[in-house]
Amino acid sequence: MAKTSMKAREAKRTKLVAQYAEKRAALKAIISGTDSSDEERWDAVLKLQSLPRDSSSSRQRNRCNITGRPHGFLRKFGLSRIKLRETMMRGEVPGLKKASW
């Protein structure tokens, strides 16, 4: 089980990423655009650097929805490998069953 503070920190990051997504995308478009001048680019870089650090999507970490475990995360289910196996064995995940051949 991950600490509650770690889960809260990730929730805060998710909220910040959603809040600043448009602004960040617009600034990145100016920086990478060929039609903008060097001065405009530099201003965009400075504005991008002044945004909160946690508003970058690369700062987010995929975590299990049940335990908050950061490793062994399966995106398709939103669970760690351990919790996926437990829920699968109880028959709570439709379409999955234990392999047998």
Curated annotation (Swiss-Prot):
Keyword check for Disulfide bond: no
UniProt KW RNA-binding keyword: yes
Subunit: Part of the 30S ribosomal subunit. Contacts proteins S3 and S10.
Superkingdom to which the source organism belongs: Bacteria
Any single Pfam family the record assigns to this protein: Ribosomal_S14
GO molecular function annotations of the record: rRNA binding; structural constituent of ribosome
Keywords: Ribonucleoprotein, Ribosomal protein, RNA-binding, rRNA-binding
Annotated family: Belongs to the universal ribosomal protein uS14 family.
GO biological process: translation
Function: Binds 16S rRNA, required for the assembly of 30S particles and may also be responsible for determining the conformation of the 16S rRNA at the A site.
Xref: InterPro entries: Ribosomal_uS14 (IPR001209), Ribosomal_uS14_bac/plastid (IPR023036), Ribosomal_uS14_CS (IPR018271)
GO cellular component: cytoplasm; small ribosomal subunit
Encoding gene per record: rpsN
Signal peptide: none
The name this protein goes by in its record: Small ribosomal subunit protein uS14
